[in-house]
């Protein structure tokens, strides 16, 4: 079958036998379609990455693959599966359609994050969902200042703050009463976590902005990135966030709809049935 995706890497992090079985079955299917199936260590040479698992597996894979400009498609064998939108039972049919050119491509923004202490960079990383400043092990409120493009925005005492991409707006930020941002929106949203005030509300800004969060009077705080990378923060530390220069490309099968995913996965705007 002629296809733009000649070399395909399969990624599955879960130790479950079900994921292993799916990896094996999909590998056989791809070889039958004339594709070369690459080992995960060779993913930089792939034309397409197929991720089997849940959203956590997809987050890790996307951050690793984005610098190689390898598009990704997800097969859900996790819990929610908001980013891994192909059901396991539809795996062969959907991947076959994608190989035949029947698919849509969607670019998703990542956050480029940097932690600076005393003028020196401590950590740089990427996040597809969100960067979160949160209280540490002692459970005390954090106090921090937020700057947008160098302009002071607010100072807040709270459990922390979430800075989410449109992709991450349906994750942790949603649980904290943040807005849903469509993936095509060039925006970030800042969502306070349990603020010690009656007036703090989420705010969305252009993703061309540089966001800085500066720790004040907070001796016990942490920064989390996609819930997978972690760094301890000290008073005076600066967390600098901006849009990554490279987006990740998601491949979707025929019939994919973001709003259908919202309804099916999150029960978005579902009417309450009366008996």
Regions inferred by a protein language model and the residue ranges of each:
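Short, well-ordered beta-strand core segments
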Residues: 49, 72, 161-162
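A residue-level signal for conserved active-site and pocket-lining positions in enzyme catalytic cores
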Residues: 13, 50, 76, 131, ...
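Catalytic core of DAGKc-family lipid kinases
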Residues: 82-159
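ATP/NTP phosphate-donor binding region
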Residues: 1-52, 60, 89-106, 115-125
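Short glycine-rich anion-binding loops that position phosphate/pyrophosphate groups of nucleotides
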Residues: 15, 55-57, 78-80, 167-169
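Gly/Ser/Thr-rich active-site loops/lids in small-molecule metabolic enzymes
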Residues: 155-199
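Proline-centered loop/turn at the N-terminus of a beta-strand
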Residues: 69-71, 189
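ATP/nucleoside-binding phosphotransfer catalytic cores, i.e., glycine-rich phosphate-binding loops
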Residues: 133, 149-152, 200-275
